[in-house]
Amino acid sequence: RIMKRLTEIPYDRGAAVRYAHTWAYCRNPRYFNYDGIGGDCTNFASQCLYAGTGVMNFTPIYGWYYLDPNDKAPAWTGVPYFRNFLVRTEPSPGPFAREVSLEEVEPGDFIQLRFDKERFTHTPIVVDVGSPAAPDNILVAAHSDDTDFCPLDRYDCRAMRCLHVLGAWKREENQEK
């Protein structure tokens, strides 16, 4: 009998941030560019997150994965679904996070921005944090509009929520005797 269990693995913040710097002003050809159909910011955020975890969740609808433009989870490209997947309470494969205050963010975390009264619509990745952490010294990278090392206070937003990545769950197969 094969037993599958989840093991917690660390989040490689450095790998996520390096990926962000590499691809902030261009597009990785392995992924579709969603600029023309709603924006590429959360697709880029997911790519960065995947670079730091290496684990996807292939659960239809509720998972977090990308195979091609027609086979991906809503959480890979959708701002609210990205957040909902990360802060889920039941362990399942893939990265996980918790919402924190702005003062608690670290490089490799994500900040979602709301520009109107309705909904959050942008997901930049934090690439550097000054001390003490504040909007003028938290630097982010993003697609749609492409930016890197951009101070958070350059965004004229009404609200923000911060997602602190804690690690990822990885499924391991063990032979049971």
Which sequence ranges carry the predicted segments?
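Residue-level marker of positions within ordered structural domains that often coincide
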Residues: 25, 49-50, 116, 129, ...
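Short, solvent-exposed loop/turn and secondary-structure capping segments
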Residues: 58-61, 123, 152
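...with weaker cross-activation on analogous glycine-rich loops/strands in unrelated enzymes
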Residues: 66-140
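Residue-level signal for functionally critical sites in structured catalytic/ligand-binding pockets
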Residues: 40-47, 109-112, 122, 140-148
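Glycine-rich, aromatic-bearing surface loops/beta-hairpins
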Residues: 126-177
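N-terminal capping segments
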Residues: 2-77
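Mature, Sec-exported extracytoplasmic domains of Gram-positive
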Residues: 12, 18, 22, 47, ...
